[in-house]
């Protein structure tokens, strides 16, 4: 897991600093707080926030893992892969890997998400339907030229895990980062 102290974080209140204080009035449910209505939904419902990749790479990768030597898990994973291809044909879905590849410690398949709408539909669906499998959801952050900003951070500090977190071998990512910094 990433050490949070390695990174800087802008204030979440940037752009909201000079607004009136929020109230403490409780909603009719008796638990949640009432928020001031603006009549305008966040732009994040329609477009991912920068620096998420809005180009060919996609804003999020979802890696769905299975233990390749566990026959039941491998069968479930292949069935899930097929179901996703049938139910979400608009998503980019890669081949079904039967062995570890890249930084991934076990076999997996990958799905790319390009829009908040796709993310909002697929991630809750996967929460319910992933069965015994673990899934890594990580962003693809890019600079203004569309080059990846920090793959290591995207795979660690910014990652979301469903199920058991698996250790990734990020040595290749780190080497590429060092080579890029040297040039």
Swiss-Prot record:
InterPro entries, per the entry: DOPA-like_sf, DOPA_dioxygen
Q: Which Gene3D superfamilies match?
A: DOPA-like domains
Record Pfam families: DOPA_dioxygen
Instruction: Report the family membership.
Output: To A.muscaria DOPA 4,5-dioxygenase.
**What name appears for this protein in its UniProt entry?**
Uncharacterized 21.2 kDa protein
The taxonomic lineage of its organism, from the top, reads: Eukaryota, Fungi, Dikarya, Ascomycota, Pezizomycotina
